[in-house]
């Protein structure tokens, strides 16, 4: 999404969230059929229909998109679906359509379950994984766009409300994560890129995430798009870790009222002393909301920070320090603890 180009050698950091999916999946499956239609308030969030994806042919499907296509439209929000992706490298472009909410896509470990594609230039068409459905959850999966340094190459686009990501690795170079619109939550994720690698107009909370910059000189971690002072969108980074090579800004404004806050986060010396960039438009210095609160590390020194960024007071920071920022208490849900087999018409006919 950025205007400047960088040419450093791309490398994927040796960082993985080694979190093994609960083995109770195998022992909790029942043979119950799909529940009848019901209102959202009557969903049993403890139980999901389980669909297995396994390249070896031992699952219900061998490709992730096939598993998604097997799920019927679910606009009455009556059923949770849990797609369990066995370890492997899945080379495909995946889309979750709007008419299929309440899907969880889960790898086994982010270190051995990969969704990879290579596409670039078009920010809306290049994503390896695109989410259009609400109430989506992704766990323990590595999502990569391997297009390289030549232009925009989105690994993940989130264009729906109420999406959560846990223990995921998301990597590309430019525009890695298009955090497009809606309320979103990212926890214990690793996100890597060089230019505007977290961008978009969503309202998102990033908690205990590791952000790694590949930019050799003056890249930007964020490019948040907020077009008015009354718009509720913005990015909050809470308890995060910023590392990398070269130098990077914390953010620059895609929209005139761009809003980004870093709190309780570690900044390595990869963060440029100025901290923030106005993207060649000094008028935005009067309208953006760029704040830091109790951050630490060599890159957190504010002595040379641009004067139009904020060192937030306790009172100013409060609104950004909890899940209330994204209304998360109303929609974030725990992982299901019980599973049902998919109906026969949903399963791959080749599987006995």
Curated annotation (Swiss-Prot):
Site (Transition state stabilizer): 174
Active-site positions on this chain: 175, 196
InterPro entries: Pectin_lyas_fold (IPR012334), Pectin_lyase_fold/virulence (IPR011050), Pectinesterase_cat (IPR000070)
GO biological process per UniProt: cell wall modification; pectin catabolic process
GO annotations of cellular component type: membrane
Region (Disordered): 332-352
Pathway: Glycan metabolism; pectin degradation; 2-dehydro-3-deoxy-D-gluconate from pectin: step 1/5
Reaction(s) catalysed (UniProt annotation): [(1->4)-alpha-D-galacturonosyl methyl ester](n) + n H2O = [(1->4)-alpha-D-galacturonosyl](n) + n methanol + n H(+)
Bias (Polar residues) ranges: 343-352
A GO molecular-function annotation: pectinesterase activity
Residues with attached carbohydrate: 76, 218
Job description of the protein: Acts in the modification of cell walls via demethylesterification of cell wall pectin.
Name of this protein: Putative pectinesterase 11
Classification lineage: Eukaryota, Viridiplantae, Streptophyta, Embryophyta, Tracheophyta
């Amino acid at each position: 999404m950025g205007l400047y180009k960088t040419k450093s050698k791309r490398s994927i950091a040796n960082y993985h969230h080694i979190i093994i999916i609960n083995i109770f999946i195998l022992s909790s499956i029942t043979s119950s059929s799909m529940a009848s239609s019901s209102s959202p308030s009557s969903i049993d969030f403890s139980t999901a229909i389980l669909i297995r994806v396994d390249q070896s042919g031992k699952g219900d499907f061998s490709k992730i998109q096939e598993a998604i296509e097997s799920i019927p439209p679910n606009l009455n929000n009556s059923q949770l679906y849990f797609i369990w992706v066995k370890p492997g490298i899945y080379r495909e472009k995946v889309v979750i359509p709007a008419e299929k909410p309440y899907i969880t896509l889960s790898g086994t470990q982010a270190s051995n379950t990969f969704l990879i594609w290579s596409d670039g230039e078009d920010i809306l068409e290049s994503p390896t994984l695109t989410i259009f459905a609400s109430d989506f959850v992704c766990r323990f999966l590595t999502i990569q766009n391997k297009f390289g340094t030549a232009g925009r190459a989105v690994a993940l686009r989130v264009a729906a409300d109420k999406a959560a990501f846990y223990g995921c690795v998301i990597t590309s170079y430019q525009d890695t994560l298009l955090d497009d619109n809606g309320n979103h939550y990212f926890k214990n994720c690793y996100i890597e890129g060089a230019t505007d690698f977290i961008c978009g107009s969503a309202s998102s909370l990033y908690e205990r995430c590791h952000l790694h910059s590949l930019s050799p000189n003056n890249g930007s971690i964020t490019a948040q798009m907020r077009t008015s002072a009354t718009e509720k969108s913005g990015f909050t980074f809470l308890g995060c870790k910023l590392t990398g090579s070269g130098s990077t800004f914390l953010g620059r404004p895609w929209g005139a009222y761009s809003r980004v806050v870093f709190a309780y986060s570690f900044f390595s010396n990869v963060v440029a002393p100025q901290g923030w960039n106005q993207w060649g438009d000094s008028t935005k210095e009067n309208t953006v909301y760029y704040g830091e609160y109790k951050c630490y590390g060599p890159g957190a020194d504010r002595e040379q920070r641009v004067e139009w960024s904020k060192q937030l007071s306790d009172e100013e920071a409060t609104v950004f320090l909890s899940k209330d920022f994204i209304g998360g208490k109303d929609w974030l849900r725990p992982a299901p603890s019980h599973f049902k087999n998919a109906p026969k018409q949903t399963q791959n006919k080749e599987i006995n």
